[in-house]
């Protein structure tokens, strides 16, 4: 039984257990100038982290726009803070490859 987007109820015998339900979040960000060159030493580490996030069920998709100026991603997580922590822990953020990141709660219509 769904209580709302943030909480779900599961009935076990006569006990009701509340647990957090993952929500979806969209990421928009901006790459630094000359990102293709600057990212080279960090790319494998970055991709390994993204693969782990996918295996953990957090990252749905992430990648650059065709002109490599913007980054777009979709996450499924318990909170916006969790997504922001993942992004700020990414080597692309720490090394200045990503220079701007914005995360928004997202409701998928279809």
Please identify what each model-predicted range represents.
Residues 8-110:
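Conserved, structured core segments of small domains
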Residues 1-8:
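N-terminal chloroplast transit peptides
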């Amino acid at each position: 039984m769904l209580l709302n987007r943030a909480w779900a109820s599961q009935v076990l015998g006569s006990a009701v257990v509340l647990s957090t339900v993952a929500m979806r979040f969209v990421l928009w960000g901006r790459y630094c100038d000359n990102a293709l060159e600057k990212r080279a030493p960090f790319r494998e580490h970055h991709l390994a982290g993204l693969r782990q996030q996918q295996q953990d069920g957090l990252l749905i998709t992430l990648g650059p726009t065709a002109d490599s100026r913007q980054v777009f991603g979709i996450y499924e997580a318990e909170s916006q803070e969790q997504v922001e922590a993942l992004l700020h822990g990414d080597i692309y953020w720490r090394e200045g490859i990503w220079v701007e990141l914005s995360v928004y709660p997202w409701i998928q219509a279809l």
